[in-house]
Amino acid sequence: MSSLADLINLDLSDSTDQIIAEYIWIGGSGLDMRSKARTLPGPVTDPSQLPKWNYDGSSTGQAPGDDSEVIIYPQAIFKDPFRRGNNILVMCDAYTPAGEPIPTNKRHAAAKIFEDPSVVAEETWYGIEQEYTLLQKDIKWPVGWPVGGFPGPQGPYYCGVGADKAFGRDIVDSHYKACLYAGINVSGTNGEVMPGQWEFQVGPTVGIAAADQVWVARYILERITELAGVVLSLDPKPIPGDWNGAGAHTNYSTKSMREDGGYEVIKKAIEKLGLRHKEHIAAYGEGNERRLTGKHETADINTFLWGVANRGASIRVGRDTEQAGKGYFEDRRPASNMDPYTVTSMIAESTILWKP
């Protein structure tokens, strides 16, 4: 091998049947991602074929030093775009040795909601628009911004093209392709309103798989920014002032909404979401009050409002849905740092299971 790059890209399939499985879990902040790798004897196609594992929870803020073992359960498998071949990424959730979900394990409660027969019958679809900001490593300032200064006002950057408008496209496109390789249902990307901010969309994907895919897409993005020497930020308002924040708009539909007469089902679901507005806001991401101000294409955090084609609303219904009399709606309240397990399951619970 002539270089480090050759070794990184070394194909093991001709020399061994063994594979590398990268186990991924959510750390103590509820947002940080951790991972470690292990060797397995051969290719794996289902999480049930994988062994549970453990890690030092005292080093992630998830367990005390005198009882530090946390157990991770494999839940979803993806192809590894970094090692390739038969190697895999494994999304896990975390439990105590006694089998109880630890506090940062939001997947466990979400799975119970998605396994409810009423929710299963409705075949919930999600499309999640994950916005994020790329920061310069040493100064934590958006890429493309002058050090200690600001770029020109917002306007030319949204879906912009050119060296003075789009900053970090190589990272964005690498991430797009890596997610498709991994088996994540990424449906698109675009540059956002604030320079240095981008978005990728996951979906439509059914049930809890939508959240699994968003988490692994975040992991892949963080690995790519690591290689690029850039810092990934999911802060919902990374730059104060007259700059757009970052959200995770969540598009949602049920089988009943997608069928004839579904628009009435949509309106009833939105009414229920309005009745639980405070509960949803409390679960929709840390620091969201800095983003949901009623400006920059947001509704005020204390006000629930819905409308057709209204990007200043809490819930937006598309013109095509209104005209067809069926379809989906967009919950614009979730922040970029939201937990997709919490948000997707809470929307399903409020619209299908909850009785006012």
Curated annotation (Swiss-Prot):
It is an enzyme of class 6 (ligase). One of its GO terms (molecular function) is ATP binding. Residues 37-66 are annotated as: Disordered. Expressed in the pericycle in the region of lateral root emergence. Keywords: Acetylation, ATP-binding, Cytoplasm, Ligase, Nitrogen fixation, Nucleotide-binding, Phosphoprotein. Residues 106-356 form the GS catalytic domain. It catalyses: L-glutamate + NH4(+) + ATP = L-glutamine + ADP + phosphate + H(+). Transmembrane segments: none annotated. Residues 19-99 form the GS beta-grasp domain. Induction: Down-regulated by ammonium supply. GO terms for biological process: glutamine biosynthetic process; nitrate assimilation. Belongs to the glutamine synthetase family. High-affinity glutamine synthetase. May contribute to the homeostatic control of glutamine synthesis in roots. This is Glutamine synthetase cytosolic isozyme 1-4. The gene is GLN1-4.
